[in-house]
Amino acid sequence: MKHKLISAKVIADSISPEGVRMTTMEIEYPRFILAELNTHRMLSKNSASSRAIPVKAMHDFIRANPATPVHWGKNQPGMKAKEELTGPESKNAVFIWNQAKEDALHWADALAHKLAVHKQIANRITEPWMTMKTVISGTEWTNFFHLRNHPDAQPEIKALAEAMTVAYTTHLPVQLKPGEWHLPYITTATYVPTGELQYFDENFNRLDVEDAKIISASCCAQVSYRKNDPTFEKAFRLWEQLIENDPVHASPIEHQATPMDISSMCRFEPETWQPGVTHVSANSDLWSGNLRGWIQHRKLIQNEAVW
């Protein structure tokens, strides 16, 4: 079932010569299910941030797009509400939910504009009514779909998983070779005479692969404040702030990846592994961070994590 504030679209979809699919989606959903989404650690995520979006902008967005439950379940023992409120009870529940939203907006505004409290605090009051935008990438989707597209899941995350399942199963991935990059928010095309994969910005200006990776990372990072400026200038400013700074904030570079050159490596001889390969699993698959069969951009960056 479709819901107004819950959506999913594929923005990059690739498959390696070994048949491992790497998919990136842009999803929208109520913030109150973010914790459930974040339990799926095999998927990389960047999301809109209460710390990054100004209070007034956040309040304007909440008033235009308030998050609401998709199923007003009656109270009962356990985690699943099977019976739904109807008639006056349902209308009253919606009224109380919306009144609580107005109260929260009032007090958050008082903190921010009367006491000059920072947005990272003031925005917390209104989080139940926020909708989230997230960029999510990975090679391991089966368990997410199995758990969340299920009758026992909370209705809102079930609706999200349904939308994501449809997006995933109806989209065809593009075949990539080692050295060719999966890059969200970057347009790609194969130059037929040479077979070379080429990269382009939103104005179809050609990019070299390193610039394309930086712009892709910038666009993934900008989800934090619900904007998308794909220009060189913005990309390189953000790259300096996030990647060339200390500490490195590397989550936006988890969405870019290239297929592993499996034929060049011996799985149980780490000295033969490509840069970026991090481990081998018990079933002999090679991994780069949370990506199977793909080299994750993050794992090619010095000091991407402190151990």
Task: Indicate residue ranges for each PLM-predicted region.
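A conserved ligand/cofactor-binding region detector
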Residues: 1-307
